[in-house]
């Protein structure tokens, strides 16, 4: 049985709750000693992992809608992507304000350049910012064919974000490896599209170099 538009609306409500409840838990944990010995790191890792979960959920929607034959599921993809961006912004903010501190924000640019894992993180965030800003139907109409080209950069984020996570923890542990494995699996489900994008990019580079 296929989902109806009304059911998808209720699903969106549930997804909004899924995006909001972790924030409420985090606020509670901060105020009631629910974090570990290094609360700053705990906040950074929690916000980063939540952003990564929403990123992977966003990529899951298309194959899930296709294989389950539920085309209306696609309507939830933008919502998940926006929650991913919101949590990624909280992740970046927690690093800037809690790790560096308000008085040391001038160091942020240097940190992002000199620490490779932070460089990967900020590249991912900038891409997510662009995708969030252009996620409306009005922007889709305005950009035309370039809209899809821009939003294909989400695949780069899916590669960079797990690497950023693995690099940031500095030790090999199961959790970041699981996220990396899920990212690889979701990319593998799109291998034909990714191969086509790679061949197109290679052709464009070759044509420019031949000029």
UniProtKB/Swiss-Prot annotation:
Gene Ontology molecular function: electron transfer activity; FMN binding; heme binding; metal ion binding; oxidoreductase activity, acting on diphenols and related substances as donors
Biological processes, Gene Ontology terms: protein repair
Location in or out of the cell: Cell inner membrane
GO cellular component, one term: plasma membrane
Alphabetized InterPro entries for the sequence: Fe3_Rdtase_TM_dom (IPR013130), MsrQ-like (IPR022837)
Record-annotated membrane-spanning stretches: 10-30, 82-102, 116-136, 153-173, 178-198
Membrane topology: Multi-pass membrane protein
Keywords for this protein: Cell inner membrane, Cell membrane, Electron transport, Flavoprotein, FMN, Heme, Iron, Membrane, Metal-binding, Transmembrane, Transmembrane helix, Transport
NCBIfam families attached to this UniProt entry: PRK05419.1-1, PRK05419.1-2, PRK05419.1-4
Signal peptide start and end residues: none
Keyword match Chloroplast: no
Needed cofactors: FMN; heme b
SUBUNIT field: Heterodimer of a catalytic subunit (MsrP) and a heme-binding subunit (MsrQ).
Highest taxon in the source lineage: Bacteria
Cofactor note: Binds 1 FMN per subunit. Binds 1 heme b (iron(II)-protoporphyrin IX) group per subunit.
Organism: Escherichia coli O17:K52:H18 (strain UMN026 / ExPEC)
Listed name of the protein: Protein-methionine-sulfoxide reductase heme-binding subunit MsrQ
């Amino acid at each position: 049985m296929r989902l109806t538009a009304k059911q998808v609306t209720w699903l969106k409500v549930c997804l909004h709750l899924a995006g909001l409840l972790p924030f409420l838990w985090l606020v509670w944990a901060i105020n009631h000693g629910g974090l570990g010995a290094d609360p700053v790191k705990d906040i950074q890792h929690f916000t980063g992992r939540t952003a990564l979960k929403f990123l992977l959920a966003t990529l899951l929607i298309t194959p899930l809608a296709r294989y389950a034959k539920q085309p209306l599921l696609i309507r939830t993809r933008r919502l998940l992507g926006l929650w991913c961006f919101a949590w990624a912004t909280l992740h970046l903010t927690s690093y800037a304000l809690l790790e560096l501190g308000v008085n040391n924000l001038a160091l942020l640019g240097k940190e992002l350049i000199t620490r490779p894992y932070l460089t990967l993180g900020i590249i991912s965030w900038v891409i997510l910012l662009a995708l969030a800003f252009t996620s409306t139907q009005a922007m889709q109409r305005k950009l035309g064919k370039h809209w899809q080209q821009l939003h294909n950069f989400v695949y780069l984020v899916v590669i960079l974000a797990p690497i950023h996570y693995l690099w940031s923890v500095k030790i090999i542990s199961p959790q970041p490896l699981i996220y990396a494995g899920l990212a690889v699996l979701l990319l593998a489900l799109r291998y034909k599209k990714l191969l086509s994008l790679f061949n197109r990019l290679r052709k464009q580079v070759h044509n420019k170099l031949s000029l």
